[in-house]
């Protein structure tokens, strides 16, 4: 993942995501969860901040000592909806239910409800000994993240699938790419990306052969056998008949067969 070799990996294969992975150099599962949540409009701007703090190039800003524990796992960057709710509870004395109302108001951009929630957040923080200026500053920080943010469980589920596909590609590259390419038979642009990956991985490609290939891409040792159904204007039904004939009467010997 740290090298950006993520073609075919769930959630991680776009060019922008590859660049983010190379810069982040994830070394724990939590990094993948964070990146899945951050790689969205709004929070995306904070990927460089997360990376710099992770690598010790920048000091994390925890906004207030009372919420340091909430923001410490994400290097001071507000990423998840749960963090927004926890901040409201710790700083302003919101109940869990009230914090969820705040989250919904931000997510749905309901200005009337949000204005009431903002006032409640600031007043609650002031009652707990926080200056009004600090409360306003923190509210302005959490507002844009709540609009676009994932909840952590959602991001974790995506990250788990991404990690599982990365594992399969790392330890079973030929099998993984064969399955991935078989799902993209008509997508020539995507197939081209996979062929470049095969070159990088030093996996040979068996050209289309009526006596060796099948409808889908098939992995055998260090060779990937081309999918006959991926040939333009050749469908699964025609290939199925060819394979059936080959298995019944042996290899084709001439065009007249």
Where are these regions (language model features)?
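Noncatalytic, beta-rich nucleic-acid-contacting surfaces in large DNA/RNA-processing enzymes
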Residues: 1-257
């Amino acid at each position: 993942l740290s090298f950006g070799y993520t073609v075919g990996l769930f959630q991680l294969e776009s060019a922008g995501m590859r660049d983010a992975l190379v810069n982040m150099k994830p070394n724990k599962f939590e990094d993948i969860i964070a990146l899945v949540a951050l790689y969205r409009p709004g929070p995306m701007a904070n990927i460089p901040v997360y990376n710099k703090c992770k690598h010790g190039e920048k000091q994390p800003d925890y906004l207030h000592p009372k919420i340091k524990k909430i923001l410490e796992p994400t290097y001071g960057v507000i990423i998840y909806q749960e963090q927004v709710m926890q901040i409201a509870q710790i700083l302003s004395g919101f109940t869990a239910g009230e914090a969820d109302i705040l989250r919904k108001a931000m997510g749905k951009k309901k200005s009337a409800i949000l204005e009431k929630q903002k006032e409640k957040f600031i007043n609650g923080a002031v009652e707990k000994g926080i200056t009004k200026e600090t409360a306003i500053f923190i509210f302005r920080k959490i507002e844009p993240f709540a609009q676009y943010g994932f909840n952590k469980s959602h991001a974790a589920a995506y990250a788990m699938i991404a990690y599982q596909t990365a594992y399969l590609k790392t330890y079973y590259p030929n099998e993984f790419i064969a399955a991935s390419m078989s799902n993209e038979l008509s997508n020539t642009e995507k197939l081209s990306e996979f062929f470049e990956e095969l070159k990088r991985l030093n996996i040979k490609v068996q050209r289309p052969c009526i006596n060796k290939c099948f409808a889908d891409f098939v992995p055998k040792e260090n060779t990937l056998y081309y999918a006959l159904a991926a040939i333009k204007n050749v469908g699964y039904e025609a290939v199925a008949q060819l394979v059936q004939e080959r298995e019944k009467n042996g290899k084709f010997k001439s065009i007249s067969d």
